[in-house]
Amino acid sequence: KKGIADILEDPSTYANHFSIVNGSVNSAADAIGVKANNRKYYSTGIQTKLDYHWYKGNAFHDVEIGLRYHYDEEDRFQWVDKYSISSTGVMSLTTDAIEGTDANRISSANAFASYITYKLKYNNWTFTPGVRYENITLQREDFGKNDVNRTGVNLATRENSVGVFIPGMGANYKFNNDFSLFGGVHKGFSPPGNQDGQAPEESINYELGTRFNLGKLQGEFVSFFNDYSNLLGSDLAATGGTGSLDQFNAGEVNVNGIELLLNYNFSNSDAKFSFPISVGYTFTNTAFQNSFGSANDLWGTVAIGDELPYIPKHQFNTTFSIEHKDFEININGRFNGEFRTLAGTGNIPNNERVDANFIVDLSGKYFITKRLSTTLNVINLLDNTYAASRVPAGLRPGHPFGIYGGLEFSF
């Protein structure tokens, strides 16, 4: 028995398996297993927010307080049917599996969150400190593959809890209507899985930037640095894992870079037609700060200084629009640089690389009334063939040429 990822990664070694999955031979019964990824989701909760602001002298004050409780649940009741396949590519059911004989478990989370933010505007300064508190209890009830009626005879449970304060601080100084500086320091947080003792993802995130106006040109430039003290990974089928959904701690990572956004309008403010253009660029640099061995395909064996996988160093996008009171047309170009699919440094090996791509999209909208409009979107206008990922199960193609139309109604 071999998974599709192993077969596609090395079709020469698994030639017999490959001939079965591509339908070039008449297989035996039960040669192919197809999993019914049956899941149900349930979510409920309540939240409230209180906002109060006032003026005193030259200062503006605003306080916001929020509370939220919610419960989320995922119910997996899955099975694997078995098939044979003919040399003409026709699959025939040979074993109709009993429902619930694969993943048969309920995962849930009870979460309470609260926050308070305070905004102070004084002369040219704006300060925005705040803090959030999260308290989460995560549970899993696994009934096992042999208890499809969920009597609990083989019930295995596990639980993990986390409580954390998440502070942050932002500041902005406005020199005039055309130029300002801003910065911030914020704690980042992502909850752990339901494995007992697993730590949450935590980071300290810094940013410093400027916003400016130069005539018709508007822009924003930001530098950022994210210091992860504990990065989380997930065992997902979508990332080449087993699909257990278990999370694992991947240690310390630094992420830094710059972002640039420019907007320009070629027309005057009183013109019937508007011709805006926007350009955005992001440079991202990543580096693990510790070494570890990982059985998860997303990381591989990691050494200090290795780059994070699936993060391109260079990303670029631009949009040009024609806007009128009755319609708008937008053409967008997006570039994603090459990226590695396993942690590493230096030149990226061919079998661990997803090449760069540039895709052009076209969209349009016609306003029938103030509330009703028709939309048209053309994805990958030039029908470029490109790879988007190497997981799950080898190279995955990006979206081919496609046309989508619809109606948009606003209340």
Task: Annotate each language-model stretch with its function.
Residues 36-42, 102-110, 119, 159-165, ...:
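Short sequence motifs at beta-strands and strand-loop junctions characteristic
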Residues 69-75, 122-124, 133-139, 185-191, ...:
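Transmembrane beta-strands of outer-membrane beta-barrel pores
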Residues 1-2, 180-182, 200-265, 272-292:
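Membrane-embedded beta-barrel scaffold of Gram-negative outer-membrane proteins
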Residues 41, 57-62, 68-70, 103-228, ...:
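Structural signature of Gram-negative outer-membrane beta-barrels, strongest in the C-terminal barrel
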Residues 1-143:
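Face-selective signature of the C-terminal outer-membrane beta-barrel domain
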Residues 56-57, 248-343, 370-373, 382:
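Gram-negative outer-membrane beta-barrel transporters
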Residues 209, 213, 261, 397-411:
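Outer-membrane beta-barrel "beta-signal"
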Residues 2-14, 76-89, 143-153, 191, ...:
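Flexible, surface-exposed loop regions and adjacent strand-edge segments
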